[in-house]
Amino acid sequence: MNQSLLTQFGDPFERVERALRSLRNGNGVLVTDDENRENEGDLIFPAQTLNEVQMAMLIRECSGIVCLCLTDEKVRSLGLPMMVENNSSRFKTAFTVTIEAAHGVTTGVSAADRVKTVKTAVAENAKPEDLNRPGHVFPLRACPGGVLERQGHTEATVDLMKLAGLQPYGVLCELTNIDGTMARLPEVVTFANKNNIPVVTIDDLIMYRKQHQKKVS
């Protein structure tokens, strides 16, 4: 990864801290992984404070496949089965069946409807019957160990929310270019600067978590 592009956002520790401040303020962050992995930047917002303007940005600027990152406990409490029994995808991305709010939506596709679905799913007292399946929101189950167990955007999202002191749920979507290709780090940085969004890498988060655990222990 071209670290020179990232230095404008601070050192790894500072990048994580900036990301956490943004999330606590109800704003988004951009999370990039390694060039040898997906080599993508995901735009991420806290599910807890998600609004229609932010959802519209996810739909407009990203791939349109808006995912809701959940803990394993939340997935089980909502009774969400995995999308497939045998996951043969390259990075074992843990999709569950897709969801829609059972009440308060129309077709489920609009930004408002997708926000409603997200809010319904992450509600503290949410029950399986509050959601219809299939739908237009794609839940992802994070590994319990977070980025220390799996170096994915799903785990990074849940880890960031926990570190920010928020509900451990977030929405993500992969940033794309205007021609539909995937945004790589140079395009991610350009988008971040244009929209005043902090950038953090999964490697930054791994380092931060390891240091944090040392302090705790």
UniProtKB/Swiss-Prot annotation:
Superkingdom of this protein's organism: Bacteria
Sites where the protein binds Mg(2+) 2: 38, 153
Gene Ontology cellular component terms for the protein in this record: cytosol
Listed SUPFAM superfamilies: YrdC/RibB (SSF55821)
Segments traversing the membrane: none
Keyword Metal-binding attached: yes
Pathway it works in: Cofactor biosynthesis; riboflavin biosynthesis; 2-hydroxy-3-oxobutyl phosphate from D-ribulose 5-phosphate: step 1/1
Function, as annotated: Catalyzes the conversion of D-ribulose 5-phosphate to formate and 3,4-dihydroxy-2-butanone 4-phosphate.
PANTHER family named in the record: 3,4-DIHYDROXY-2-BUTANONE 4-PHOSPHATE SYNTHASE, GTP CYCLOHYDROLASE II-RELATED
Name of the protein described by the UniProt record: 3,4-dihydroxy-2-butanone 4-phosphate synthase
Organism: Desulforamulus reducens (strain ATCC BAA-1160 / DSM 100696 / MI-1)
